[in-house]
């Protein structure tokens, strides 16, 4: 059986731009992409904490250390600069891989600098 599991996540990033007149996608600071294990052109889910919108798109790298989080194209209608978002990448793996895999979870400061990187989430 193949399971779809959390691969990596950028938690509570601040949207810096929304560019309607662009082909599509989300632009993410390359440093943040690497910290979360997210690749160029990878499909991601974006959850807007402010308004509850959920969408899927693909990633293009932004300038390293810029803090850019820019929703492009039609996705720009669903977010506003200043909104907090969660950017989630998933991976398919078998059950043995899923039990061993530890996702990269990147917690953000308000200025889109990295607050903490962990390899798990815990509600304990």
From Swiss-Prot:
Binds 1 pyruvoyl group covalently per subunit. The gene is panD. Its EC number is 4.1.1.11. InterPro entries: Asp_de-COase-like_dom_sf, Asp_decarbox. GO terms for molecular function: aspartate 1-decarboxylase activity. NCBIfam families: panD. Keywords: Autocatalytic cleavage, Cytoplasm, Decarboxylase, Lyase, Pantothenate biosynthesis, Pyruvate, Schiff base, Zymogen. Heterooctamer of four alpha and four beta subunits. It is an enzyme of class 4 (lyase). Pathway: Cofactor biosynthesis; (R)-pantothenate biosynthesis; beta-alanine from L-aspartate: step 1/1. Is synthesized initially as an inactive proenzyme, which is activated by self-cleavage at a specific serine bond to produce a beta-subunit with a hydroxyl group at its C-terminus and an alpha-subunit with a pyruvoyl group at its N-terminus. Substrate binds at residues 57, 73-75. The keyword Cytoplasm applies. Its cofactor is pyruvate. It catalyses: L-aspartate + H(+) = beta-alanine + CO2. This is Aspartate 1-decarboxylase. It is found in: Cytoplasm. The lineage of its organism: Bacteria, Bacillati, Bacillota, Clostridia, Eubacteriales. The active site is at 25 (schiff-base intermediate with substrate), 58 (proton donor). The modification Pyruvic acid (Ser) is found at residue 25. GO terms for cellular component: cytosol. One of its GO terms (biological process) is pantothenate biosynthetic process. Transmembrane segments: none annotated. Catalyzes the pyruvoyl-dependent decarboxylation of aspartate to produce beta-alanine. Belongs to the PanD family.
């Amino acid at each position: 059986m193949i399971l779809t599991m959390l691969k990596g996540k950028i938690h509570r990033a601040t949207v810096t731009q929304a560019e309607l007149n662009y082909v599509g996608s989300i632009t993410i600071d390359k440093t943040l992409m690497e910290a979360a294990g997210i690749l160029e052109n990878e499909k991601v889910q974006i959850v807007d904490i402010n308004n509850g919108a959920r969408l899927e798109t693909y990633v293009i790298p932004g300038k390293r250390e810029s803090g850019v989080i820019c929703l492009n194209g039609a996705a720009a209608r669903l977010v506003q600069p200043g909104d907090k978002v969660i950017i989630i990448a998933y991976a398919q793996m078998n059950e043995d891989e899923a039990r061993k895999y530890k996702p990269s979870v990147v917690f953000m400061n308000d200025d889109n600098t990295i607050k903490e990187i962990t390899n798990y989430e815990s509600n304990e």
